[in-house]
Amino acid sequence: MINKNDIVADIVIDYPKAADIFRSVGIDFCCGGQVSIEAASLEKKNVDLNELLQRLNDVEQTNTPGSLNPKFLNVSSLIQYIQAAYHEPLREEFKNLTPYVTKLSKVHGPNHPYLVELKETYDTFKSGMLEHMQKEDDVDFPKLIKYEQGEVVNDINTVIDDLVSDHIATGQLLVKMSDLTSSYEPPIEACGTWRLVYQRLKALEVLTHEHVHLENHVLFKKVS
């Protein structure tokens, strides 16, 4: 049974669908997930701890036996899973979404300057993530696999620390984009492109939080 002293990130490791519940009440299970459920709920004004625990325990009871839980994968299989489930979809979404973000800034930015800042922040986020994922694929992940196979990797702790630092910077950019868009809530006068951009940026945030959580709290723990 899940209780108030359990760690947020650990709950999501054991029950991935719990991420949806934490997300719905604004609790960070990603870079800020190493806190108890009680401590996390106290930081949120409108979160009832008992109600939150009930929802989490409902997820625990309905957890489907035999469903894929990445925590049971070995390092090399987990890396393949991360690349297929997050790296490739993110690259594809960046390619498809960028023209809409650019259009939104160009058309509506003159009257809504925060949309220009949104594009600049998105561009920084995109370039950082693309560079980060490529480095993981080409350099860092092969080192983790070598470590799993028993080879000596002298800088393994530095590799992990650097990746976690990148993830923290990524999280800060996500927070900034959410703040600029009032948590991706479009204004009443928003056109179709405006609404599309907000909707897809919000989905991008969800995907990135899941991605970073899986690396920080599952993959890296297997090699540290």
Curated annotation (Swiss-Prot):
Q: Which GO terms describe its biological process?
A: protein repair; response to nitrosative stress; response to oxidative stress
Keywords assigned by UniProt, alphabetized: Cytoplasm, Iron, Metal-binding, Stress response
GO function terms (MF aspect):
metal ion binding
UniProt-annotated location(s): Cytoplasm
Concerning Gene3D superfamilies, the annotation shows: nmb1532 protein domain like, SP0561-like
Q: Which InterPro entries match?
A: Hemerythrin-like, RIC_family, ScdA, ScdA-like_N_sf
Instruction: Please name the Pfam families in this protein's record.
Output: Hemerythrin, ScdA_N
Name a GO CC annotation attached to this entry: cytoplasm
Q: What is its main location?
A: cytoplasm
Job description of the protein: Di-iron-containing protein involved in the repair of iron-sulfur clusters damaged by oxidative and nitrosative stress conditions.
UniProt lists the family membership as follows:
Belongs to the RIC family. ScdA subfamily.
Assembly and partners? Answer: Homodimer.
What protein am I looking at? Iron-sulfur cluster repair protein ScdA
Species, as recorded? Staphylococcus aureus (strain JH9)
